[in-house]
Amino acid sequence: MRTEYCGQLRLSHVGQQVTLCGWVNRRRDLGSLIFIDMRDREGIVQVFFDPDRADALKLASELRNEFCIQVTGTVRARDAKNVNADMATGEIEVLASSLTIINRADSLPLDANHINTEEARLKYRYLDLRRPEMAQRLKTRAKITSLVRRFMDDHGFLDIETPMLTKATPEGARDYLVPSRVHKGKFYALPQSPQLFKQLLMMSGFDRYYQIVKCFRDEDLRADRQPEFTQIDVETSFMTAPQVREVMEALVRHLWLEVKDVDLGDFPVMTFAEAERRYGSDKPDLRNPMELVDVADLLKSVEFAVFAGPANDPKGRVAALRVPGGAQLSRKQIDDYGNFVKIYGAKGLAYIKVNDRAKGLDGITSPVAKFLSTEIVEAILARTGAQNGDMIFFGADNKKVVADALGALRLKLGKDLSLTDEDKWAPLWVIDFPMFEDDGEGGLTAMHHPFTAPRDMTASELKAAPENAVANAYDMVINGYEVGGGSVRIHNGEMQQTVFGILGINEQEQREKFGFLLDALKYGTPPHAGLAFGLDRLTMLLTGTDNIRDVIAFPKTTAAACLMTEAPSFANQAALTELGIQVVKKAENN
């Protein structure tokens, strides 16, 4: 039906007769001439109808936005004065000789001239995807997956599929369950990741595996989360953690070079402890120049309990955050930031405005100045590198609250005051995470997952002091987003059972849930390690959007619903009966 795409026509096509298929993007009727912008997935081209082709001109008068049409015509060069430098096809136009209206369009529920609500865009997603910017994002996503496959193939990785219907395992989020008709009362789980299957593939001898795979997590959603998402899943045997990172870093550098024409350079490596200490986050945005600076040792003796208490508490912390040019902030803005940090558990926000360093205490403005000596103020200013016109905010509490509050404040200030370099790419690796964290109920939970190996510890050492264990894990972070994470896996049965025990999984439960894994570990398991990238998040970064729904063709809402198909929906009673399922309605509160 077509010979060319609209958006691919150039001066090299001048004089050629072409047939185009697509949609009316815009129509301009000048009486004796009608111009339309005709659009397909590759872009837009101007088509015009003149009186010499009367039948085509007459039919063109009926055209409206989003009519699906076929046009045959001749490519012509535009006059110099009519060249449109903003269009890829702006040097040419098509003189139509024939027009076919394939399908007409009703009045559109989306307005191309206004910003539509996200609800409307998701309900009429098939129309939203016609927009050039949406089409471009999905084309970029397709390019990324193609680049990934070629890279992995070139590096000896095998693309192997793993099951979608599997067994529920604890991985930190709720499973989506699928009832079995054959085995009534039993359920499959949709995989949160192919974690155990890819480890079993390593035990099977496939030493380099990858898969671009759908995963499912029934969890509360955020702007960058979806209930179903796509991973670039990778596992290797006989490779150390640095070797895995080297290959995966090369993959990401390849993507940025091919898609953005950007050389990311070598990725710095930072420990979890350093990232939390300097940036208050395990996924620091290094485009932001501000850092948290410890000042507890300077404040242990001050007669101000808000500072002195945490400064003298081994579990406490007092940190300062220097804000370049922050002295310009108004009292209302400061109060707003004080309320902001309370979201993260902080009780308030002490500060020092640096007006004139040379004047000591007389050169600052601070509600806590009366508790500080000239020597302490000068030491704080020196340690933070404060200059005239800067602001210093303080966090004083337990270590987690200080990191969370000042880390979030750092990001917000970076955006509000334009301190974060939005034109920069800042990748890094974060390594050496704690293996376990407090579950809030007196027990421990795995910070990554229960199959991650500890660094430099035997099973007996781990059992004796699990709180000291460091995971042989690594996350890739770009511009404050965790785009991938992985670890060296446990390849020893004793170590795996020890970890299960620390997590409160007794031997009977271990056999019920992971018996197949524990059995497999008995038969010559190789050392193995892997990683998974979030394809959706990578695409989000590479296309410059801040909403992950913009890079998924048919995404869910933050309530895990599809507004277009109205899923999820109620099942009919016959289907439920066949599955042996009874729906119990919650009693309404009186």
UniProtKB/Swiss-Prot annotation:
Binding of L-aspartate, residues: E171, R217, H448, R489
Gene3D superfamilies named among the record's database cross-references: Bira Bifunctional Protein, Domain 2, GAD-like domain, Nucleic acid-binding proteins
GO biological process per UniProt: aspartyl-tRNA aminoacylation
UniProt keyword terms in alphabetical order: Aminoacyl-tRNA synthetase, ATP-binding, Cytoplasm, Ligase, Nucleotide-binding, Protein biosynthesis
Catalytic activity: tRNA(Asp) + L-aspartate + ATP = L-aspartyl-tRNA(Asp) + AMP + diphosphate
Molecular function terms from GO: aspartate-tRNA ligase activity; ATP binding; nucleic acid binding
Described function: Catalyzes the attachment of L-aspartate to tRNA(Asp) in a two-step reaction: L-aspartate is first activated by ATP to form Asp-AMP and then transferred to the acceptor end of tRNA(Asp).
Family of the protein in this entry: Belongs to the class-II aminoacyl-tRNA synthetase family. Type 1 subfamily.
Subunit structure, as described in the record: Homodimer.
NCBIfam families: aspS_bact (TIGR00459), PRK00476.1 (NF001750)
Matches recorded under HAMAP family: Asp_tRNA_synth_type1
Name of the protein in question: Aspartate--tRNA ligase
Species in which this protein is naturally found: Salmonella arizonae (strain ATCC BAA-731 / CDC346-86 / RSK2980)
Biological classification of the source: Bacteria, Pseudomonadati, Pseudomonadota, Gammaproteobacteria, Enterobacterales
Gene encoding the protein: aspS
